[in-house]
Amino acid sequence: MNSKKKTGSYYTPLDLADFIVQHLKPSLNDTNSILEPSVGDGAFIKTIIANNIPVNQISIVDINDEHFKNIQSIIPQEININTYKEDFLEYNNENKLFSLIIGNPPYIKKNLLQKAQIDSCKSILTAAGLKSSAKNIWTAFFIKSISLLDKNGILAMVLPAELLQVSFAEELRHYILNKFQRIEIITFDNLLFECKGQNTIIFIGYKESKNNGVYFSNIENLSDKKLTLNQNNYITHSPFKWSHHYLDTEDLQFIELLCKKIKLIGDYCETKPGIVSAANSYFIINEETENKFHLHKYTLPILQRGLFVNDDIIYTKEAYAKLIKEGKPSKILCFTEDNTKNINSHVQSYLNIGSQMDFVNGWKCSKRKIWYIIPNISTIPDAFFFKRCHQYPKLLINEAQVYVTDSAYKICMKTGFDLSSFIYSFYNTLTIVCSELFGRYYGGGVLELIPSEFKRLPIPYVAINEKIFQQFYNRAKKAANITEILQENDNYILKDNLKLTEEQFNQV
């Protein structure tokens, strides 16, 4: 496994550290003591010294002390420096508080943490009155740093954009509103850490400030020295995620009011995740592999990824046949205890390959009675929704009768509602906009909706006949983009059915 994933060590580029320090410089005249809790190669300390920030004492903490000597060599003699070779989660220095805490905490998912680290995270979060189930180590670093600020302290950290948008960070967002008088959040158009694959933000919190509130700014790149901070206190107390700070209060209030009048996706259908294979690269195969190992008896048709679907609203038999012809993974192995009692040598060869690749000891496979038997194959869905998308969310009728992986949610209509009407009603601007507002973004502009977010999307359901749906389908096939698909639907769904005024319609 990549060592960076284990240690969370994604060192801060000097230009990013300098950008933050330059922005903070006017607020650092009275800085007495500075702490960098995960110092790494010392990018922040280097830029603080280079910018002549007045400071009496610097403390640096890191689990790896190999950089300490280099950092110490650049710090002027008149500044006291304390070094601590330990995990910051265990750091304890007799309740010493700091004027500035600055850094880039490690990013390590819970499943890669050691038990001692998990226990430390729980203790830190519990002590702060928060839920103890930390999803990632950065949350504990963040909360502990807040607790070490003095009454006028400033916290400046490079954090994952998760803080603004994911469900588990909602509690953190409420927490920081109570801890800081002023908050500044700076977002970027581009990834700052390509290897991380995670959108990044700059968080700055001021314990005391003459200009209170929550301020946001988005910049294209670090060379852009023009930083305009805009206050948006409404979003911090609305049901929307902070990642949509660029929308003004009037727009957010308008959307919130509309959403309250409309039923949700969860009112019309049941949703379940698709098949969890535990190792798609092994259990989902193409036709060539199926032929080579004589696996025809053991496979079922499957659509693995949303990327394999064109911009369509029906996944047709022809589309699936094309997927097979292109050599894409399109068959899932469905072994059972019965059908593997007398397997031939070809099939056994394929199972041996899986054993040699150590899938048997994988986290999910190891929990199975027989490692290669996938549980809960379940049923073929009538329709499916891909939880991740690029240009727009995709909800499709499953004409091809294929299974789906857990990259999609299976759709089953509740009694009294029609699937074609549901698909038609989904493709309107309000529902698509809300998917952007309710979901979360990952590196490269990927939008994801977790099950709870998908189920609470508002959908102005209208019952239509098959003739109207066929017209919609034909129009969608010819459309150059999602905007063309939505335009015609909006007139009928939002104007005629939802009875929006011309002004409201244009605002949507």
Regions found by a protein language model. Name each.
Residues 5-21, 38-56, 61-70, 80, ...:
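Signature of N6-adenine DNA methyltransferases within the class I
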Residues 30-40:
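Conserved class I S-adenosyl-L-methionine
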Residues 212-219, 315, 344, 466-471:
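Short, charged, solvent-exposed linker or helix-capping segments at domain edges/interfaces
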Residues 240-283, 346, 463-508:
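Non-catalytic DNA-recognition/assembly elements of restriction-modification systems
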Residues 253-465:
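Polybasic, glycine- and aromatic-enriched phosphate-binding surface used to engage nucleic acids
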